[in-house]
Amino acid sequence: MLSENRRNYALIGWLICGLGALFYSYEYLLRIAPSVMETALREHFNLSATGFGNISSVYYYAYVPMQLPVGIMMDRYGPRRLLTFACLICVIGTFLFTGTTDFWVAASGRFLVGLGSAFAFVGVLKLATIWLPENKLAMVSGLTSALGTVGAMLGDNFLEIFVHRLGWIKTLNMTAFFGIVLTFILWLGIHDKKGRYRQSGTVSSFKKGMIDLGIIARNKQIWVNGLFGCLVYLPTTVFAELWGIPYLRHAHGLSAHGAGLANSLLFLGFTLGAPLMGYFSDRIARRKLPMLLGASVATVLMLVILYFPGLNESSVQILMFLLGLFYSAQAIVFAVGRELSPGEAAGTAMALTNMIVMLGGMLLQPLVGYLLDFSYSLRSGASLSTALVVENVHKLYNMTDYRIALAFIPIGMCIAALLTFFLKETHAHAPK
């Protein structure tokens, strides 16, 4: 009987974590939506590449700094109320974004989407620390990351189809209505309370949470681990989430559908690779080896995609899939962040790790847009205002412009591989 109760408890835990992961997948779809709507958004809001990068990256201006308070709030208040409220905020932000032609109002909508999304990933990991065994954390972070990329794949393929048929406004409004339904599902399905066989690290006071944050933030290993995650994740935060589809269309001559498919194959590789990397890391009780291997191979693949001319569509698709498969080792950093920190501050530790990881999107998405405009200006001698002529959007930038603007991605990934030599091996063991 006791064994059966344990199995039932474990099943409930996985289902609850799955609901949280569903919200993460939903917010991920909202995150990458601008990448499949580039032309429509630039026409609607009259944007240059710099402006397009800025309006997308506003998401991160809320998402990144919110990670620290989100971690403390998760430890203090639990995931149920916070994830439900966060989903509702995403819905409001989406409606605000689609209901205006003003850049700043739209940017405010993206900010709200980022604000709500900030709770998603950390919320799932917090649910895992409450409901699942500690030795499953790397696998849970991998599975959660995988479900997030399912949202990205849906965005790259189905959103592109709906945008073509219905327009971007109706398409995003449909996602907002789905978010309303999801809000009720989260409230009814998620439970915070720890069960009989598992103890949660809930922080009893905000003051204690701030003390824990101070301890964690002073741990240099947390920053090394987070910086690895940030740099090896650049193919997602900078390339696939925003600039991947425009690059594949402009530089390799792929159609909108072909570019979306190739981009989604990167997410598919990550979807399959993240839980496998987590399982492999848990099984061998080592973190650094899969992190080093994944970052090293992914760096080579990124260089080939960016700097090898004459790639046909099939080659690009295979390379994108393999890139996603290998850099999915990034998902391990959340387990490492937990294992480098005391158990009562699990949410805070993983939130700080996630904040560092997502800095890449906040800082570098708009930088790519600026570098594209700057490279075009140097090459053509034309004013950046030319970029506002929508008919010229797909003629402005050539492969050289993109190679210059995206060069820091493989450089950053190479640095990530080197950082593993400065990271402590936790052997998949977390302090209590």
Task: Label each residue range with its predicted role.
Residues 65-104:
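Conserved MFS/SLC helix-loop-helix module at the cytosolic interface between two early adjacent transmembrane helices
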Residues 88-101, 296-310:
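C-terminal ends and interior cores of transmembrane alpha-helices
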Residues 34-36, 219-275, 334, 361-369:
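Extracytoplasmic gate region of multi-pass secondary transporters
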Residues 109-148:
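Cytoplasmic helix-loop-helix junction between adjacent transmembrane helices
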Residues 144-195:
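Helix-loop-helix hairpin linking two adjacent transmembrane segments in secondary transporters
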Residues 46, 78, 99-105, 133, ...:
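Helix-breaking motifs and short loop linkers at transmembrane-helix boundaries and internal kinks
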Residues 76-86, 282-296:
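Cytoplasmic membrane-interface "Motif A"-like loop-to-helix N-cap segments
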Residues 2-9, 193-226:
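Juxtamembrane intracellular "pre-TM" segments in multi-pass secondary transporters
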